[in-house]
Structures are given as structure tokens and as C-alpha cells.
Amino acid sequence: MADPSSSGRSSTTITDLDMDTLTRCASYLSIQDISNMAVSCKILNRVAYSDSVWQSFFRQEWQNVAPLWPNGSNQSSSMREAYLFRHTALRQFKYVDPLFRHIPTVGKRPHQILFDKNTILFSQGQSIRSLHIDDLIDGNISVANRGNHKARVTCMRLFSLNDTYLYQSDSGRDDNILVTSSSDHFIRLWSKGGSRCFKGHNAPVLTLSDKLLGDDTGKCFASGGEDGTVRLWSINCTGKRGQQALKATLYGHENVVSLMSVAGHKTSLLVSISNNGKVRIWDTTTASSCIRSSCCVGMTSVPIAPVGMKCHESLLYVAAGTSVTAIDLRTMNRAFTIVQKSKIHSFEFLPSKYSLCTGGTDSALLWDMRRVSDTLKVEPKAELEGHVGHVVTGGPDDLFVNVWESDSGAQTNSLICSAPDMGGCSAMAVDGCRIVTAGDDDRVNAVLRFRDFKTATCHVSSLV
């Protein structure tokens, strides 16, 4: 039986509202919500593409910045195009007037840098140091010492507290914890509550897993080092010097364990590589210190002295010698190999662009993974020239970090990272439209250079 109170009422839907009302309501939504609206129906598609909605987004994101349209013309372009043009250009550093801060530091050049939301973390010798970005923007340059190892820091990783039981309140779920390894044989976990020490390796610890392993009930991370072992550590356990945190010691490598990565299709699988090119895959759900090598579920080999590796979905990419080899972790068969003429010194995988980049002696090469097969010889889609020396993080002998478009390989900018006649770039980190580089200031001091392009207004095209 119909509800009497509803009799006589007319049926009204969202599409009965006028365009002005809809666009005003849409201005309170996120860009993701607007994208969902665009595919729902024709009327909401018109709202999602309206200039008033995107003008609101533009003003919220970049106050006091005038819109710039592609090709410098605003006659036929929409505000949506202006927003997307600036959003993309900022992340490609296509501006010449970013907010810039010169940060001198006493001692050795930083060799690892991480962005932790609004904080910059970097290692300098045996020390872990930090900078608050809000202070930098306000012009207050103050480097804080987070803590120290007893020898050089070899690896730094950030893991989300949401994946652990270490947060004290719901507000802390979105925070990160820092895990570092060192030549002093120790691993340290740094959080707001202090630090914890993990002891187990008998030699310098060189590498840490790039992600946490396991499910919600038992998250752990892995480490590898010069003692040839892979060790699994519980992220949640406590105890003196971390003895209770050591879950398992995995044996099987006969050489230094230099790299490791967690499989993309199964978070319980860990891939480790030693300096002699031996690759081992471990199922960490069956790991036990009581049974040696029992959880090794696959082995293969690549050229010696690998310089980089990355797991994506079910494939493992390993750069070593003059080649990058892709291995299917489900079958342990080689999917394909790409080869370049010069030795590879650095490697980075860009899954969103189906691309990988290899750094050689005097240039970098950009490869399109969609064109790769094991039967055809593949040429790089772009050669990124302009560097001097080995392309590692810009080049240790190059004063500049060069910026390239990942689609075309076109150079978009060049950023100085070191003083003239000094060494080149020793480390760098990128977070959206922010970049930090490390280099030399003089013969005694190192320098960090921080650039934030968010408020930049002078596009590189205006200088042509």
C-alpha cells in the first residue's frame, strides 16, 4: 500500500535541477567525484566539464595564479584544459621560477633522501637528519638530527603505520615509520615514540625490502647483507635489541645479498639477489629459522653485479651488465631481455607509463614495455642525452639534474644541484611538484637544494 504522506508529491531527480545549481553543488566535490559524474549521464557530463567547476578547482589549488592554456591560446580552450595543463606542467617541472631553498650541511654529501609527507629525511654518513618543509617555505632553515647509527647508513625505507599495530590512536594511522640499515650490522626503526634496534646480522646490512610482507595479522620486513643471509623481522614485536622481532633467517645465497623486492602479485613472496647474480624467491609464509632454505620456491640467475631490480605484478625486472631481464615469477621463465650498448649504472621502472629507464655512461634510455618481446630486437623509444658521467641520480660528475618527458623523452628543464667545479648529484627525491637534490657546496660542506614548483608562474615556453 502506498504511503499516504507521499501522495500528491511530484517525483524530482537530480537531473531536474538547473545547470547553475548543479555546478554550484559540484564545486564541493573532489576531482575524482567529478570524473565519476562525467560518465554517469549526459547532463552530469556537461556539469563535469563546465568552466565554472574547473575554475573553482583552479582557484582552490593555485591562488593568485593566472590560468595558462596549451600553446598559449585561450580562445578555444576550456578551464579544464587549463587546469590539466598546469597540473601536468608542474609535475614535469616546466617552470623556471620555483620556490628555492639552499640548505648547507656540514660533512659528507647526503646519499639517500626521502619525502615523508611534509618532512624531508636524508642520511649523511652515519646520521639520519630531517627538515620540515613548512619551515623551509617560511625561510627557516633548520636541520634536525633524527638519530645515529655507528657506521654508514646503507638503506632507508618508509612503511605506513596503517600496516602495523604501532600507532597509538586513529590519528596516527596515516603516519609512516622509518626503517634504516647500516654497516654497523644493525637495523633501526624510527617513529614518533622513539627508535628500536634490530640485531641479528653478523656483517654490514646492505638492503631492506621495498614493501612489507604478509597479511594484516603478521606484517614483516626483510633485510639482506654481507653475511649472505636474508632475515625476516616482525614490524610489531618489541624486545631488547629486537631479538623477539627476528622471525626467520633464510640461507642459500653464497655471496653478498645486495637487492630485494616484494612480488607485486603476492605479498608473501620475496625476491633477493646476490652480487654474483643468483636470484632466489622465498615464500615467507613458510619461513622458519629451524629449517634451512625450506621456503625457497624458485631460483634463476642474471649477469653479475646487478644495479637495480623491481617487481611489478607477476614480473621481476633486473638490470645488470648491459641488459634488463624480465622474469615471470609464476614460472621462473624469462619473459624478455632488452640490451643496450653501454653498461647500465642505474635503473627505474615507470609502471603507469609502461616504461623503464636505464642510465648509461653518457646518456639515459627510455624503453616502451608494450613494444618488447623475446623474439624481436627492440630499440629505445628515446635517448635522454645531456648528462656527464654515469647517470645515477642525475650523474655524480654532472652539476645539473635534467628533467625529461616520459612519453617523448624531450628535455623539459635542467636544475643545478652542486657548486661549480664540485662533484655532481649524490642523491635526489621527487614528490609531486617538489624536488630535493644533494651535492657539494665547497670542499668541506655539502648542500641540499629544495624546489617547490606549486606557486611557479613563469612557464619555460614563455622564454622561447
Where are these regions (language model features)?
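Terminal intrinsically disordered, low-complexity extensions flanking WD-repeat/beta-propeller proteins
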Residues: 3, 22, 398-399, 407-464
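Structural hallmark of WD40 beta-propellers
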Residues: 34, 117-121, 163-179, 195-196, ...
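Intrinsically disordered, low-complexity acidic/Ser/Thr/Pro-rich linker and tail segments
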Residues: 2-15, 19-27, 31-152, 162-168, ...
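WD40-repeat beta-propellers
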Residues: 128-134, 187-191, 230-234, 279-283, ...
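Loop/turn-rich, solvent-exposed surfaces of beta-rich toroidal or solenoidal domains
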Residues: 385-404
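Canonical WD40 repeat/beta-propeller blade segments in eukaryotic WD-repeat proteins
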Residues: 107-113, 150-170, 203-213, 254-263, ...
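Short C-terminal beta-strands that terminate individual repeats in beta-propeller domains
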Residues: 101-104, 142-148, 195-201, 240-242, ...
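Conserved strand-to-loop turn within each blade of WD40 beta-propeller repeats
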Residues: 123-125, 181-184, 224-227, 273-276, ...
